Amino acid sequence: MTKSAKIGVLLANLGTPDSPTPKSISRYLWQFLTDPRVVDLPRCKWYPLLKAIILPLRSKRIAKNYQAIWTEQGSPLLAISRQQKDALQAYLDTQNINAQVEIAMTYGNPSIQSAVKNLLKNQVERIIVLPLYPQYSSSTTGAVFDAFANALKEERGLVPFDFIHSYHIDENYINALANSIKVRLKSDEFLLFSYHGIPLRYEKMGDYYREHCKQTTIAVVNKLGLTENQWGMTFQSRFGREEWLQPYTDKFLESAATQNIQKIAVICPGFSVDCLETIEEIDKENRENFLKNGGQSYQYIPALNVEHAHIEMMGKLILEKLA
């Protein structure tokens, strides 16, 4: 391809607080938990509960977790996202694509709104939105679409855009996952695929996230040639009292040893960037959970982050839209 009209690329992810303090985290959680895509309870009931109980308690507890993983460059999610941006920009440059890549967060900073403004200020003639959620869910990819649409509402001129809905069975994505696992998985380890959960009620309302997770898992399992007793699939990070997608990751790990699973490797294919939910919850809390309940060894297989195959996959998704 030759250089022509300038395109804008939005690498969209969930977001992060600006600092690991209760105040900053409370502000971030308010934005996150008041999005009806995430929590669809009646506002008259949800908001008072959120303000009076949930935010004060969760902000203090989560602050300690963030402080344990915070870096000089900010949260791991933000630091790695910046690296992804630079790497994707470099890849597109090698493909002779006239592009400007921006990272954009649904909640927190840099916001999707500010990223869109940056692109339009630099006179891009087309925008490609890539939510870094391989498996579609209304509460993640759907929320990115809402935020992007709201950002465009403020503009009189509507530039053409493409929105990448999902890539859960994209060949390059599956190969990147399989290769990442292959170089780390030991022959005697059980492989657990852990995905972020959603309320079961959302699935009953039409969200097909679980099916996307299954399709990703089966594609990777087939690529690796694993047998039925060598792998499992669970869902993590639930909160609140209602039922979420099951089986739950923490409950599975508590009882794994009783199922003769002594050595385990956990991968989280739905996370494109390592963050609080993988570093603290999976690599620390669930490691402790598994080992204290009779497990012998536990390894967390990192997110694809800035692996070359991951960046190349992103680039090829962009190139497909330009073909």
UniProtKB/Swiss-Prot annotation:
Catalytic activity as recorded in UniProt: heme b + 2 H(+) = protoporphyrin IX + Fe(2+)
GO CC annotations, alphabetized: cytoplasm
GO MF terms held by the record: ferrochelatase activity; metal ion binding
Compartments where located: Cytoplasm
Superkingdom per UniProt: Bacteria
Gene Ontology annotations of biological process type: heme biosynthetic process
Protein's job: Catalyzes the ferrous insertion into protoporphyrin IX.
Entry similarity comment: Belongs to the ferrochelatase family.
Protein name per UniProt: Ferrochelatase
Native organism taxonomy: Bacteria, Pseudomonadati, Pseudomonadota, Gammaproteobacteria, Pasteurellales
